[in-house]
């Protein structure tokens, strides 16, 4: 179907567009972006007062299927993506079975073909069964369609194994994504180390458990002239290490999550399992460092680390609750509030962080409204305030500390490959 989006404020950093434009969609592609377009054969979307941008790309999504369908499925997770304005998500490999072989990728790819509501890319596992001991077959995974490789959920802690992974990643030209955590330093911890963990009597996780591993990854990447992407950066020290490495020419990129630059460890005073995540919520100083790193380019992308868990896994004692929260549906309004409304960055910068930059890092032909590109478009009402209620949640799980919160910035329309899949905030998808 042909669509004509009229009167939108279009923001497309790739083409330096930031103003009122019309967008014509034809045959699943962007046909034109011009000051005024007329086409009587197209369905008109009047976007007056709304902001249109390339669809968001999430580098870090846990869709849980195959193997953990009680938490999330590819169908429900990609419904949440649509609701949050994400048109492409990258599913992490900590499924059951892990994404460590072409056969296991094929299982996920079959489900994606049948049930996904957005574009889904797959992260292969760096090591077999994500056990951190023996490398997966990188060439096989790349040929099978893996977009990058990670053992996310845990890090590859053996130095020799990670060094071998870097060497093979250079050989196969595939990006490694690091869950930077030294479990010897974080062992048994449940929240950030500091006054609040002491006051609450909860076992701490030090900043060093993250930044020491970030330091190692960068040293290995530098020595082997390899690329590395650091997932879910949460500490001031990590930001400083990454900034220094970039100045030295190391091919390092990094992401931060909205919860890590929105909340501090003070949120854990509620003892709610929905404030427990890995990396943990950090101090005010860490949050400020993340925001500055997003502003100055030290951190390249915003990712959700959407991590659904069932009620019985979260509504328990804090020590026993699983790590992780959902994030696809709240990422944009949180980032808009903390980064744009505060005056720290402008909308063009935010679109870069959520769409163009993740696309570039992963080598995807996304994140742009260039004519000929896939018509993946998100249209937002920046002024609309709404409550993130349990009834609103499209994910199979509701583990979010933002449930019940007033948010600003509402996704009105989401196009995926030229198909209108969210209209006036309502999903237009059939049940799987």
From Swiss-Prot:
Its cofactor is Zn(2+). Zn(2+) 2 binds at residues 152, 179, 232. Zn(2+) 1 binds at residues 60, 62, 152, 305. Pathway: Pyrimidine metabolism; UMP biosynthesis via de novo pathway; (S)-dihydroorotate from bicarbonate: step 3/3. The active site is at 305. Keywords: Hydrolase, Metal-binding, Pyrimidine biosynthesis, Zinc. GO terms for molecular function: allantoinase activity; dihydroorotase activity; zinc ion binding. Gene3D superfamilies: Metal-dependent hydrolases (3.20.20.140), Urease, subunit C, domain 1 (2.30.40.10). It catalyses: (S)-dihydroorotate + H2O = N-carbamoyl-L-aspartate + H(+). Its EC number is 3.5.2.3. Substrate binds at residues 62-64, 94, 278, 309, 323-324. One of its GO terms (cellular component) is cytoplasm. Binds 2 Zn(2+) ions per subunit. GO terms for biological process: 'de novo' UMP biosynthetic process; purine nucleobase catabolic process. Signal peptide: none annotated. InterPro entries: Amidohydro-rel, DHOase, DHOase/Allantoinase_Hydrolase, Dihydroorotase_CS, Metal-dep_hydrolase_composite, Metal_Hydrolase. Catalyzes the reversible cyclization of carbamoyl aspartate to dihydroorotate. Belongs to the metallo-dependent hydrolases superfamily. DHOase family. Class I DHOase subfamily. This is Dihydroorotase. It comes from Elusimicrobium minutum (strain Pei191). The gene is pyrC.
């Amino acid at each position: 179907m042909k669509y004509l989006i009229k009167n939108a404020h279009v923001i497309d950093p790739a083409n330096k567009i930031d103003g009122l434009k019309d967008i014509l969609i034809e045959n699943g592609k962007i046909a034109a972006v011009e000051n005024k377009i007329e086409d009587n054969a197209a369905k008109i979307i009047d976007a007056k007062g709304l902001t249109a941008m390339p669809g968001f790309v999430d580098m870090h999504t846990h869709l849980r299927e195959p193997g953990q369908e009680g938490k999330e499925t590819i169908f429900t997770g990609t419904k949440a993506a649509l609701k949050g304005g994400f048109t492409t998500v990258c599913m992490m490999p900590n499924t059951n079975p892990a994404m460590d072989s072409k056969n296991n990728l094929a299982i996920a790819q079959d489900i994606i073909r049948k049930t996904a509501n957005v574009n889904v890319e797959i992260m292969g596992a760096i090591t077999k069964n994500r056990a951190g001991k023996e490398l997966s077959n990188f060439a096989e995974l790349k040929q099978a369609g893996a977009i990058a490789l990670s053992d996310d959920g845990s890090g590859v802690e053996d130095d020799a194994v990670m060094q071998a992974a870097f060497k093979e990643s250079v050989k196969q030209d595939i990006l490694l994504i690091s869950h930077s955590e030294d479990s010897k330093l974080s062992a048994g911890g449940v929240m950030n180390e500091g006054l609040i963990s002491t006051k609450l009597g909860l076992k701490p996780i030090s900043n060093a458990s993250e930044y020491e591993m970030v330091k190692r990854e960068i040293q290995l990447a530098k020595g082997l002239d390899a690329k590395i992407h650091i997932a879910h950066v949460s500490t001031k020290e990590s930001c400083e290490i990454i900034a220094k490495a970039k100045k030295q020419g190391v091919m390092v990129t990094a992401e931060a999550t909205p919860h890590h630059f929105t909340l501090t460890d003070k949120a854990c005073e509620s003892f709610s399992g929905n404030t427990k995540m890995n990396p943990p919520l950090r101090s005010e100083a860490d949050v400020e460092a993340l925001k500055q790193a997003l502003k100055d380019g030290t951190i390249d992308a915003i990712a959700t680390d959407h991590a659904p868990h069932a009620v019985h896994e979260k509504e328990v004692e804090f020590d026993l609750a699983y790590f992780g929260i959902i994030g696809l549906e709240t990422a944009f309004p949180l980032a808009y509030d903390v980064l744009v409304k505060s005056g720290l960055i402008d909308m063009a910068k935010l679109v870069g962080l959520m769409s163009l930059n993740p696309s570039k890092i992963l080598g995807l032909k996304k994140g742009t409204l260039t004519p000929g590109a896939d018509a993946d478009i998100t249209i937002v009402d920046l002024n609309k305030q709404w409550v993130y209620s349990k009834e609103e949640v499209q994910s199979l799980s509701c583990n979010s500390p933002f449930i019940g919160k007033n948010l600003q910035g509402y996704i009105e329309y989401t196009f995926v490959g030229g198909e209108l899949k969210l209209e006036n905030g309502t999903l237009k998808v059939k049940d799987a």
